[in-house]
Amino acid sequence: MITDIFLYPFMQKAFIVGILLSVIIACLGTVVVHKRLSLIGSALSHSSLAGVAIGLLLGFSPVLGAVGICVVAALCIEAIRKRMPAFSELAVAITLSVGIGLAGVLSGFVKNSSDFNSFLFGSIVAIDSFELIVVLILSSVVLLVFLLMYKELFYVSFDEEAAALSGVPVGLVNFVFTVLTAVTVSVAARTVGALVVSSLLVVPVAAAIGGEESPTGFHTT
């Protein structure tokens, strides 16, 4: 029977990780789309490949390398957005270009290309216990943040100036959201691949909007 596949531990891990990532990526995607940063997933996922290459070259976990580089890239995007608010899309374009360039150069020095390709195309059935624990912790943090900061996140995503005038700590909200997005994208790249993460971040949200511009309208379409 088809349910027999869930008797295998690796399929159980893949099933759990797939469900958890689909939930938290969708949550983050709603804010990403309304902040007009739909390509941030592509920029971060390609930047994570540079972190993977660094991890493989220096002999430590490529997942940690991907997370570290992704966080740095996300903070760079936020810094450029603050410096040039009228051209915020340039932040994503610049980071995407640098990330692809670094990944391309560093990948040439990686001896075992199969490890690097596993992040490029993903391998959800190859998830180990450590990565499962990382996804469980990350999912808990993302869901907790959305429960506690739901209104603030969407207020900032629509109008940062109005949110600041209303007393919302815009800098803190943006920092927390940026770091969570970076970590989620880098971890998801290991399961579904860096080439697909950006689609998971944007396409489901675009389909859910269905002409509604309000995030609360997703549920009524």
Annotate each PLM feature.
Residues 4, 9-13, 84, 92-151:
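Transmembrane helix-bundle core of multi-pass membrane transporters
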Residues 19, 23-27, 68-76, 102, ...:
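Generic alpha-helical transmembrane segments of integral inner-membrane proteins
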Residues 11-22, 58-72, 136-140, 186-201:
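Structural signature of hydrophobic alpha-helical transmembrane segments
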Residues 1-9, 23-34, 51-61, 152-162, ...:
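Short juxtamembrane and helix-loop transition motifs at transmembrane-helix boundaries
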Residues 131-204:
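Helix-loop-helix "hairpin" substructures at the membrane interface of multi-pass membrane proteins
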Residues 16-28, 41, 45-46:
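The first (N-terminal) embedded transmembrane alpha-helix
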Residues 30-112, 209-221:
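Short loop segments and helix-boundary regions at transmembrane helix junctions
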Residues 15-20, 63-68, 91-94, 132-137, ...:
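Hydrophobic alpha-helical transmembrane segments
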